[in-house]
Amino acid sequence: MINLNQKQEIDEILDILGENLSITETQHNAAVQSYKAVGNWLTNEESELARYSPVISPQGSFIIGTTIQSINPDDDIDLDVVCELNGKRPDWTQKDIKELVGDQLRNHKKYESILDDEGRRCWTLKYRENGNPNERYHMDILPAVNTTGYSI
């Protein structure tokens, strides 16, 4: 059994760990700003995606508030986003849908410059603000199609 002093020490250690593991408010705000900007670009009226009423939403640890700092100083924070289209042409394959989203990202000067090599399932934007390791994150954008009419 632990005594009151030991419990307080453990609580303090856990608080410090929580503060050091969680992303900072600045990091969170930068990620939110980026996610919203990408969403605005992918859903704007001029977009090739517009006719499919895309919905852009964060996923994974970011949406549930458990995003953590990277352990390796060369790594960055991971932000997962889904670009959900409501419908598609009947002849489209998964590759066609992914290419449509990639084309829209490449049509934006900033996103084209930070677009990583094509991934297997998603597009990745690599943000490197001022070269500061604490301001590095990447956004994985996963194209999807809502075929059931149900969405989160």
Give, region by region, the residue ranges found by the protein language model:
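Short hydrophobic/aromatic beta-strand micro-patches
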Residues: E84
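Glycine- and aspartate-rich repeat motifs characteristic of hemolysin/RTX-like Ca2+-binding segments
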Residues: D80
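N-terminal regions immediately upstream of nucleotidyltransferase
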Residues: M1-D76, G87-D96, C122
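Conserved catalytic core of two-metal-ion nucleotidyltransferases
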Residues: L42-E45, I64, K98-I152
